Amino acid sequence: WEKTFAVCWYGVYYGCRAFMSALVASDGAHLVNVSSVNGFWATIGEGVPHTAYSAAKFAVKGFSEALITDLKVHAPHVKVSVVMPGHIGTSIGFNTPKVLRGDNAGAAAQVQSMRKRLLGAGFPAADVSDEQLLKLAAERAAAFRDSAPTTAAQAAGIILDGVRAQRWRILVGADAEYLDKLVRAAPEHAYESSFIDDMRAAGHFTALMPGKDKR
């Protein structure tokens, strides 16, 4: 929990602290912080806890929004944007275990963590072999990258266009835009099963949150 929160929140915070003096000293600057759709909707589906990541992304969004006024007062030439991507096709599923645990030494820890999550979600994972779990992890990582509606290159283009237009709020992907509208239209229902069903019916986040019949 602490490591996820530290990377996703303090990584942004300390990055801003490290570069702020240089930004203020420049003639013009633009600070771009990456939050997530989980910065305004704190789940990835029913029965899947997502607390540490969502808390960090909410923090990034709130911090970035607060900086808008702060910088208008103290450094009006420095602009701020907060980026909220939806499902973007990256290799994060492959790279995260390598960075956090190492290529080989961390395989056992990855299997143990994955087995625990699957059992907690009600999947019969006790008798599944380590090799099968590692294969499943690789398949999921590939599916996350390859089934995304927005590529990493497209996401970069959307972000740069938003910065050029000096938009402080940049939603990345049609799925992010749809989710934002849905949450705003019915905030009290944002964590109900029907809310997720509405997203699936509209064709958004189907790879990340499959229907109950596909779990």
Identify the meaning behind each predicted range.
Residues C16-R17:
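A short, exposed helix-loop element centered on a Lys and neighboring polar residues
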Residues W41, G45, A66-V78:
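Active-site-adjacent segment of SDR/Rossmann-fold oxidoreductases
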Residues S36:
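Residue(s) in the substrate-gating loop at a strand-loop-helix junction
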Residues W1-E2:
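Substrate-binding pocket helix/loop in short-chain dehydrogenase/reductase
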Residues Y13, F58-E65, T69, G157:
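Conserved active-site helix of classical SDR/Rossmann-fold NAD(P)-dependent CH-OH oxidoreductases
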Residues V73-I170, A174:
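SDR active-site lid
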Residues Y53, K57:
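Active-site YXXXK catalytic motif of short-chain dehydrogenase/reductase
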